[in-house]
Amino acid sequence: MLRFRLISGSLLASAAIVALPIVLAQAADDTFMTMAKEYVAQAAAPVTTWTGPTTGPKAQTGKLVIYVSADQKNGGAQGVGDGAQEAAKAMGWDFRILDGQGSVPARSSALTQAIALKPAGIILGTIDAAEQAPIIEQAVAAGIKVVGWHSGPAPGKINGVPGVITNITTDPLEVAKAAGLYAVVDSGGKANVMLFTDSIYAIATAKTNAEKAAVTGCAGCKVLSVEDTPIGDLSNRMGQLTTSLLSKYGKEWTYSIAVNDLYYDFSAPPLQAAGVDPAAGYPRQISAGDGSVPAFQRIRDKRYQIATVAEPLHLHGWQCIDELNRAFAGQPPSTYVAPVHLFTSANIDKDGGAQNIFDPGNGYKDEYRKIWGVK
């Protein structure tokens, strides 16, 4: 009898030891899911408070600013240019937009043309600063002030390209984290994710790495593949790639996360052709930027996209002008970084979403006008 009790006790102890890692793993995953839900809720909350600068130099006068867009088909680059143009008008500055047309040679040509116009400042609209470093340094040597939007992997100074005064962006790692965690939450912790990126851009690579970290932090989720497809050639590649991935992964593929909404402009037709339900079918598509007009429409209509982590494009355009104004006045950058914001069908008509853009209701235009001393 004593021996039986000893054996039974040993078996119970062994069972407890075996079960302990399972219990700990479950607790860790519960903690991760709680964190993910809280993060997503905060990212989707209304934006009502201005957290940017409240002091700075008054408007400098008589300036010409050139906005060099990497590709005006990119809704993000186009939107920032629109915001910068509006802010430049408030300043009384001359403003021009040049289109890099989605290729390295065309971007180089547009930058060279911008320098020839002898502006006071150049804004890089999602032009990778490392890619165009020699021409940027030519601009700086000519006395031109240069700021970037999505021109490097993080806000602030860009390593290796000291001539760029500051890089303006929502923190891309937080943008990517929001996209990744939304897939985790929406799936109930069971997302099988395809990641779409463009390694030409350092910021895209940084986003993709952060998306992967967010997804793989969930024990029941996994990344199926990372697909590196140039944004500038999506119209030719994305349709066939989507069809190929559907054939390879079938129903195992439940979520997509792309570094830009533009990917889904071209994935929707093959999904429809494959009989995927636009609202309830899989894969469910999420974008880690930038909040394009078609993306807002897809989310509102529940057609092949469930979320975008939108950039405040017009706000960023105004910030570009503010940072140039600070540089013209001999002052340092503001270091302002706008917080991330997640749009889903639940909040798609808030914070500018009704107009198909993330335009925060925090009074940023009035705040910048007060700093500059203009109406």
Where are these regions (language model features)?
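A residue-level marker of the well-folded mature domains of exported/periplasmic proteins
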Residues: 3-6, 26-375
